[in-house]
Amino acid sequence: MIQTQSTAIKRRNSVHKNLFDPSLYQIPEPPRGGFQHQKKEYSKETFSNQVFGYDITSLKKRFTQLFPSNIQGYLPEVDLRITIICSIWYVTSSISSNLSKAILRTFNHPIALTELQFLVSAVLCVGFASIVNLFRLPRLKHTKFSKALNSFPDGILPEYLDGNFRSSILHKFLVPSKLVLMTTFPMGIFQFIGHITSHKAVSMIPVSLVHSVKALSPIITVGYYKFFEHRYYNSMTYYTLLLLIFGVMTTCWSTHGSKRASDNKSGSSLIGLLFAFISMIIFVAQNIFAKNILTIRRKVGILPSSSTDDVTSKEGQPSLDKTRFSPLQVDKITILFYCSCIGFSLTLLPFLTGELMHGGSVINDLTLETVALVAIHGIAHFFQAMLAFQLIGLLSSINYSVANIMKRIVVISVALFWETKLNFFQVFGVILTIAGLYGYDKWGLSKKDGRQA
């Protein structure tokens, strides 16, 4: 009997099938398009743990040890990866914002500038994707430059780049799928309206005043999540955001006050403020809409799927009533390319029927110097958009709005030093803004529900 029982046990072990194993009932997923995304075979450095060859944890520890022990407890927690991305984002944004104002002084055609900006961005996307695809060839993929390209965070580059230009670029990257069009068409509309209104505002009022209006975006974002999504925020969130907004507006209005006598065009200023406000609303709407699309973490996706992830309950049994979502996300190069193409297409009709037909000076004003500035502006905008997409996926909507406020402070500070005009109220406004950012990071959104925004 003992031998028979052990034999039966061996037979059951040889079958080794659990009736509650969800893999028994898994239905093969249908193809998600004309091609199947495949996993990368390239060795890729973990960007979240390494920055320029240094370990993030050791760098943070060394930096903290520079301060006395009684001060270390008051230091805010710093994510070095996000700090580096934000720093580069601030530099490129400063270049882009100040160049747009410089271009519009001699080339006062906001719609034409928007059209050229979309065109340069689309060309850069195709060129960058082609270079990455080239260095996926077997003879080039082990070079240092190829390893640097492969160290980009997840979600930046397409997964299907394999070195074959015809299949990867011509047949996949340049041929949009239904998913890509569903994702990028609404964002292209946001880009179209946002860029035109922003350039219109910059052409009518100072850059500082445009950014002071856009500084209201965190308040609008918090209001949306509170009244429409029923999110909870503690009182410190509102206090720190108000301090933040007050600091930004103090800096901007103190800069604008010195120009009020020379630029006293009430009608033009009012229209410029209206364009800036519309641009701010578009920014908030795009931020909220793009959050679920640009987030790389495995959470709710944009398409339903029969993926086997998270399909079992705690007891190990298959869950039939649990909603499952697709982990499929569109990479940021593809999003930026098709957003630029859609924005270019939508801007083409207003450009042809407006500035080109009725303002015949567009071609005459497009000098060689203007073309060079537009090219530099387009390159800076390309990197700015890529970094913004990456930050939207890494940060919450409120944190991204605050990072965007800090970006505006850097832009305004660069403009102030560029114009060599600095007064007490501008410095006071910058200090208030930094204090608001510190307070928001230290005490704001302390509740778990608030962190999920």
Swiss-Prot record:
Entries under InterPro entries matching the protein: Sugar_P_trans_dom, Tpt_PEP_transl, TPT_transporter
GO molecular function terms attached to this record: antiporter activity; phosphoenolpyruvate transmembrane transporter activity
Membrane topology value: Multi-pass membrane protein
Topology, Lumenal side: 132-172, 223-234, 291-332, 393-413
Note: Present with 784 molecules/cell in log phase SD medium.
Function: Able to suppress the functional loss of YPT1. May form a channel. Protein SLY41 is not essential for cell viability. The SLY41 gene is a multicopy suppressor.
Cytoplasmic side: 1-110, 194-201, 256-269, 354-371, 435-453
Organism the protein comes from: Saccharomyces cerevisiae (strain ATCC 204508 / S288c)
Annotated localization: Membrane
UniProt similarity note: Belongs to the TPT transporter family.
Superkingdom in the source lineage: Eukaryota
Parts of the chain that traverse the membrane: 111-131, 173-193, 202-222, 235-255, 270-290, 333-353, 372-392, 414-434
The gene coding this protein: SLY41
Main location: membrane
Name this protein carries in UniProt: Uncharacterized transporter SLY41
NCBIfam families linked: tpt (TIGR00817)
Signal peptide feature range: none
GO biological process terms, semicolon-separated: endoplasmic reticulum to Golgi vesicle-mediated transport; phosphoenolpyruvate transmembrane import into Golgi lumen
One of the record's GO cellular component terms: membrane
Keyword annotations of the record: Membrane, Transmembrane, Transmembrane helix, Transport
